[in-house]
Amino acid sequence: MSTSTSRTLFPAIAASAALLLSACSTAPSTNAQAAPAASMNAGNAITGEGLENPAPNVTRNWGELPAGRKWGTTAGIDIDPKDGNVWAYERCSAGGAGGGPVDCDNTPVDPVFKFDRNTGKVLANFGKGVMVTPHGIHVDKDGNVWVTDFAANKEGTKGHQVHKFSPTGEKLMSLGIAGKPGNADGQFNQPNDVIVGPDGSIYVADGHDAQGMTTNDAIQAGLERGATSRISKFSPDGKFIKSWGKIGVRHGEFRTPHALAFDAKGRLWVADRGNHRLEIFDQDGNYLESRYQFSRVSGLFIKGDTLYAIDSESAPLNHPNWRDGVRIGPVDEDRVTAFIAPFDREDRVYQGTAGEGVAVDADGNVYAAEGPNSIVQAGGAFTKYSVK
């Protein structure tokens, strides 16, 4: 039963500054499910004050771009597990510094890049004519590159899919129905991210709109029109297995599952961006636990026993007082131990702006994929934060 739109589902979002002024305070609750009190931090997880920056040397506009091209926005970046280099994409010179709406379908350039992690030189570049709006990227243990295509073209013949490429750019598999968003089994409606699990199963985070649904009535309307906020699981050969989750605030529900990661224990982490939390599941979709100290997470990366979470969206109206940036902490605790600060931005004087995707190389250097909120301030699609 829905309630009046005047009653928000997340009163704590508007009041998070008051509720979370100390790093050990209780995180926002979700429909009477209280978040556990976080462990005491050495600094402040909200502002980043008093926290170490492990990668203080900033290289803006990192990575080479072919002659004649301008950087477009991005949201995804990953590390090749075979050689340690960097995979990412840019949206065909559009959506940010390049200007214009994102439309890789009608822009004859290759959006997917492999960069040398030391020099930024292009090692591979492909994907022309396959996607409309790339969103998430993942490199599996065999070096295959997976990319989600977030939106459809005008003709309804491309988009709302997940594509698997070989390391040289051969398209090996596509999931979803080309150009047809929906909530049926095996279908996608704005797929955000993709990851391959330890046994080769494929997991897709699907549904982007729900983060703006802040009332029960808005959520109900979204469900009625077929909007999704779920995780879909497929076999290694692409057969649909199951989905779990819907738009909501309870555990196992999401308001925009924006990014995915696996830890060394084989647990699946979901950045539930609209609910300002991380949700952790086993590989069958059973809820295990949550994290609340890492803010409004857009991108995730787990390296060993360390979690890196990047916040690109916290702003005065959706998450007061929380600064954008990269929060770093131990996988097994809800505790932030380090922080990489955001870029300055005039309309977010206190909170700043940071990228959407994050990855970390073998040396501990951190890479950010700059989205529409940050690409102008960053000066390019990718930023490298070096340890030395």
Residue locations for each model-derived region?
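C-terminal motif of bacterial Sec signal peptides marking the signal peptidase cleavage site
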Residues: L21-A23
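Bacterial N-terminal signal peptides that target proteins for export
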Residues: S2-I13
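Eukaryotic scaffold repeat domains enriched in small/polar residues
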Residues: Q33-K388
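Bacterial signal peptide processing site
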Residues: S25-A27
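Residue-level signal for mature regions of secreted extracellular proteins and peptides
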Residues: A17-A18
